[in-house]
Curated annotation (Swiss-Prot):
GO cellular component: cytoplasm
Cell compartments where the protein resides: Cytoplasm
Cofactor(s) required, per the database record: a divalent metal cation
Catalyzed reaction equations: Exonucleolytic cleavage that removes extra residues from the 3'-terminus of tRNA to produce 5'-mononucleotides
Lineage of source species: Bacteria, Pseudomonadati, Pseudomonadota, Gammaproteobacteria, Enterobacterales
Protein name: Ribonuclease D
GO annotation (BP), single: tRNA 3'-end processing
Length: 369
């Protein structure tokens, strides 16, 4: 267990002589907005280290290691770990490769868990009984430490095997690009002024109600970040929507809508002030009504046609259809095509490696809609 600044510096100096590392994190995120880092696991091919973030104060050597361009950092299903690194250190591992992504290019399902991968490659069944442990509690038990260490001990040799398999299959460039896309997604920070678009059933609201929802959702997200509270512990999403829908004028009306006592006690006056602000807006300051994607004419038909095209293409190229196009990515494409959401960048299905395989066929298909 690495618990001092000097020990961490020595570990990082040794690790920087290697070309690849396996990394993992353990964290807790129950009531907080940001993940609370409890442990970092590192394996450089020679030494497994468990790094205790609760006792270390000087992170510069580790940050330099994270950013060392000569060392590939392997993680498995690392999307949340990327967020943990970004929040704790202001950066993500780079270059970074996700073994779950690698595995999906050589026949494994996209959702392939680490224990499944370990059993497939080594025949070892990992003990997952500590997965729900409190990683902020100290001291950690020997069993907890063994569980945490196993995640990186097995990861690095499996990563090397998968890299070779993906290279032989001709997908290495695509896999690396997919990992870059993961990093890019995790680096995108939601603008509080756009948070209203993420609220379930926002499309059911009229323009003035939407203006109210925009104010409410922006306030809630800022408050959650400021207080480090999960957004639903500020005000539950369904209650936020009800406030926008009914635009109450008193604490009694908030109570009648079903808001909790703590929501009214801590935030009731603020909610009412935001409702009043929305009521005072001029008509030309109100947002346009939101279209509901699934109610668009032809949605079900075009979705089915895209799924069929993806299935056909994935079979031809021997990679999983799940990897090639998720429901989220198909909906992103259709939102872009019908201009239902802000047009910030090209959809994932017609850019990068997916665009090379699907782009022209999708553009032709969408001409009918």
């Amino acid at each position: 267990m690495i618990t001092t600044n000097d020990a961490l510096a020595a570990l990082c100096e040794t690790a920087r002589t290697q070309r690849a590392l396996a990394l993992d994190t353990e964290f807790v995120r129950t009531r907080t907005y940001y993940p609370q880092l409890g442990l970092i696991q590192l394996y450089d091919g020679e030494n497994v280290a468990l790094i205790d973030p609760l006792t270390i104060t000087e992170w510069a050597p580790f940050q330099a290691l994270l950013q060392d361009q000569n060392i590939t950092k392997f993680l498995h299903a690392g999307s949340e770990d990327l967020e943990v690194f970004q929040n704790a250190f202001g950066m993500m591992p780079d270059p970074f490769i996700d073994t779950q992504v690698l595995a999906s290019f050589v026949g494994h399902p996209l959702s392939c868990g680490f224990a499944t991968l370990v059993e497939h490659h080594t025949g070892v069944a990992l003990d997952k009984s500590e997965s729900r442990t409190d990683w902020l509690a100290r001291p950690l038990t020997e069993r907890q430490c063994d569980y945490a260490a196993a995640d990186v001990w097995y990861l690095l040799p499996i990563a090397h095997k998968l890299m070779e398999q993906v290279r032989e299959a001709g997908w290495l460039t695509a896999a690396i690009n997919e990992c870059r896309l993961m990093t890019q997604r995790r680096g995108e920070v939601l603008d509080p002024d756009e948070a209203w678009r993420e609220i379930t059933n926002a499309w059911q609201l009229r323009p003035r109600q939407l203006a109210c929802l925009k104010l409410l959702a922006g306030w809630r997200l800022r408050k959650a970040r400021e207080r480090d509270m999960a957004v639903n512990f500020v005000v539950r999403e369904e209650n936020l929507w009800k406030v926008a829908r009914h635009m109450p004028g008193s604490l009694g009306e908030l109570d009648g809508l079903g808001l909790s006592g703590s929501e009214i006690r801590f935030h009731g006056k603020t909610l009412l002030a935001l409702v009043a602000q929305a009521q005072a807006l001029l008509e030309d300051a109100l947002p346009e009504p939101l279209a509901n994607l699934v109610d668009m004419p032809g949605y079900r038909k075009v979705f089915k046609e895209i799924k069929a095209l993806v299935q056909e293409t994935s079979e031809a190229h021997k990679i999983s259809a799940e990897l090639m196009a998720s429901r989220r990515q198909i909906n992103q494409l259709l939102n872009w095509h019908w201009k239902l959401k802000p047009q910030n960048q090209l959809p994932e299905l017609i850019s990068g490696w997916r665009g090379e395989l699907l782009g022209e066929a999708l553009k032709t298909l969408l001409q009918n809609y």
